[in-house]
Every structure is written in C-alpha cells, then in structure tokens.
Amino acid sequence: MAQVIKRKPTSPGRRFVVSIVDKELHKGASYAPLTQSKNRISGRNNVGRITTRHKGGGHKRRYRIIDFKRNKDDITARVERLEYDPNRSANIALVLYTDGERRYIIAPHGLSVGYTIVSGNSVAIQAGNVMPLSNIPLGGVVHCIELKPMKGAQIARSAGAFAQLIAKEGNYVTLRLRSGEVRKVLADCRATIGEVSRSEHSLKKLGKAGATRWRGVRPTVRGVVMNPVDHPHGGGEGKTSGGRHPVSPWGTPTKGYKTRSNKRTDKLILRHRNKG
C-alpha cells in the first residue's frame, strides 16, 4: 500500500513536496525485452517548428511495452513484480504466463506479487482478470476498457481510474466513468476487473518548478505579457487585462468554450462529463 509523505522543509524546494512512496515496487531495472528507446521531439515537427507548446527537456526515458489487449485467453499468469513506469501515472506489473511468456500490464489496485490472473470469456470476478463487458455483473467496477473489440484498452488507464457498469441493453452496456460521463460501449469489448492502482497520485505535489522541468514540461507564458505579434492579448501601454474575452494564441475562445466535434460517437454518450 502506497504511503503519502509530506517532506520536511529542509530547503525552499522541499517545503511543499508531498511524495507517494510504495515499498512494494521493484528497485532494479525494468525487463529489457519489453522496453524500447523513446526519442523526444520536444513538441517540434519535421521542419523544427513548435507544434505543441510547453514541451522540452526532461529526464531520458525508456518506453515500457504494455499489453493492453490481454488476448492470451485461459492461460494463467503470475505476478512477478510491480514496477514504476515514468510514462504513466499508474504502476505496472510484470506477469509470467504458464507458457513462459512475460508481459507488462497496468497494475490494478490490490494486486501483489504472487497473485494469479487470467483472461477469458468466463473467468472469476477478481482484480486483474479480463473478460467481455457482457459477462460482468451490474455494479461491477472495471478499468482498461476497450472501445472496439480486440483493439486494446483505451478508457480508464490512468492512476485511480475506473468505470462502473450500470446497465445492459442489447449489444451495448452502459458505463459511468469517473469524470461523470455516462456512455454506451459494445458488450463484446473487454475490460479488466477492479480500479487502477496508485489512487493516491492526485495527492502528489511536486513542490518546485524544477520538478516539472524534470518531466519535460516547460513554462506557460501568459498572453497579456506578450507582444501583439505573439498573442491576441499582447501589447498595450503598461499592464492590461487583454481587452477581450480569453482566447488562444490562434484566436479560438478558451476557458470553457466547447471544441469537441465528433457526431459519429455523440449518439453513444448519454451524459457528458462534469466540468473540471
């Protein structure tokens, strides 16, 4: 079980730090055959222009190849170890199948070393097992949910995430997501039982700007302190408030303006998510 630790203020940079410490995590290196190099492009495109702002720098990482499909049916796997993954907020687990293959999976809450998991159409309802949504009882809590059968998990993959199955009707089941959104998903899609590990992640505080830079995130500059050539809010004599409703650098209204436009899947969303 992870612990939330508030650090002693031995320096200005440590004063506001709140850390998440999990003593069950593996202390050594990751499993090399399931990792690959990850090149940073710092938000630039092929001609070197910035296409995504506020990216650059940060500690070098290796990508862990995660099994989001969980398609080895009716073959049990034993959890060898739990690991930290720098590429996501949740912990990951290295599992060993009885046929000798190893895979990384998103670690659900409550999973420990030595536990046995399995995927299939009719498996036990326990954390880490995978089955079609049609076979999961109403009220069940799931994560790593597919949107298309056998495409791999796309929903509820971050730390502490989960969805609750609240209805079944025809070829679809209805899920209530943690954001408050209620949507339909094909009943043949698979999901993992339980919620994602490391639910304490939301309590973590980095404590200083440098810790954000270690993660490859650069500062965000306000538009009102820029020049008119750089932002619609820029310019003016002395300090100004921008003089117009908030917009992005490209003139799109922001701070609450809806930009989602996907009519193809709107029919599957019964209630949109709560405002953040």
From Swiss-Prot:
Coiled coil: none annotated. Residues 224-276 are annotated as: Disordered. Keywords: Ribonucleoprotein, Ribosomal protein, RNA-binding, rRNA-binding. GO terms for molecular function: rRNA binding; structural constituent of ribosome; transferase activity. Gene3D superfamilies: 2.30.30.30, Nucleic acid-binding proteins, Ribosomal protein L2, domain 3. InterPro entries: NA-bd_OB-fold, Rib_uL2_dom2, Ribosomal_uL2, Ribosomal_uL2_bac/org-type, Ribosomal_uL2_C, Ribosomal_uL2_CS, Ribosomal_uL2_dom3, Ribosomal_uL2_RNA-bd_dom. The keyword rRNA-binding applies. GO terms for cellular component: large ribosomal subunit. SUPFAM superfamilies: Nucleic acid-binding proteins (SSF50249), Translation proteins SH3-like domain (SSF50104). GO terms for biological process: cytoplasmic translation. SMART domains: Ribosomal_L2, Ribosomal_L2_C. It comes from the Bacteria. Belongs to the universal ribosomal protein uL2 family. PANTHER family: LARGE RIBOSOMAL SUBUNIT PROTEIN UL2M (PTHR13691:SF5), RIBOSOMAL PROTEIN L2 (PTHR13691). Part of the 50S ribosomal subunit. Forms a bridge to the 30S subunit in the 70S ribosome. One of the primary rRNA binding proteins. Required for association of the 30S and 50S subunits to form the 70S ribosome, for tRNA binding and peptide bond formation. It has been suggested to have peptidyltransferase activity; this is somewhat controversial. Makes several contacts with the 16S rRNA in the 70S ribosome. This is Large ribosomal subunit protein uL2.
